[in-house]
């Protein structure tokens, strides 16, 4: 199983957030994600450049923006002194105090267009980031995450950690 300690310090890691559907629950505010038009909890998925699942942080309420979850879950401290690739949801997430640098694609200026070089840079950036989308898709193959979690919200974090451990064992079985 690959952990953050196994990833060389000079290798970049890739981060992305996803929503685990839970349905709307009485007494739990902030679960509805306006971006995804669904209620659930958000998780932050970290993988290496080969697509190996390194870490999953969370859960946070589904309405929490990726950049806010990044800081709330302490990923900026755990990934200190590393180059991290993220999407536009992580704009402004670099942390000078820990040395964590989050590279994001170049954003199109209002009323303007990107130059050819910026478009190529974004293309390469997104091609590298595709592995984290694949890692999320592999996680979401587990029925408890794909069909929506229907158990008590107090245990959703435990269920997510269990699924992550099982997925790591599935992709990297222990040598016998």
Model-derived regions, located:
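Short, well-ordered secondary-structure "scaffold" segments embedded in the functional core
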Residues: 1-176
């Amino acid at each position: 199983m690959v952990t953050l300690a196994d990833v060389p310090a000079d290798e970049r890691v890739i981060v992305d957030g996803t929503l685990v559907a839970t349905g709307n629950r009485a007494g739990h505010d902030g679960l509805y994600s306006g971006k995804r038009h669904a209620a659930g909890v958000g998780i932050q998925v970290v993988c290496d450049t080969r697509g190996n699942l390194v870490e999953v942080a969370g859960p946070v309420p589904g309405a929490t923006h990726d950049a806010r979850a990044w800081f709330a879950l302490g990923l900026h401290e755990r990934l200190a002194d590393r180059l991290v690739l993220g999407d536009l949801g992580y704009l402004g997430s670099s942390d000078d105090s820990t040395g964590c640098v989050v590279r994001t694609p170049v954003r199109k200026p209002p009323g303007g267009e990107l130059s050819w070089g910026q478009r190529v840079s974004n293309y390469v950036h997104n091609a590298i980031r595709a592995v984290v989308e694949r890692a999320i898709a592999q996680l979401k193959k587990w029925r408890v995450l794909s069909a929506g979690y229907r158990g008590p919200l107090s245990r959703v974090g435990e269920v997510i950690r269990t699924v992550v451990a099982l997925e790591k064992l599935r992709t990297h079985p222990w040598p016998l």
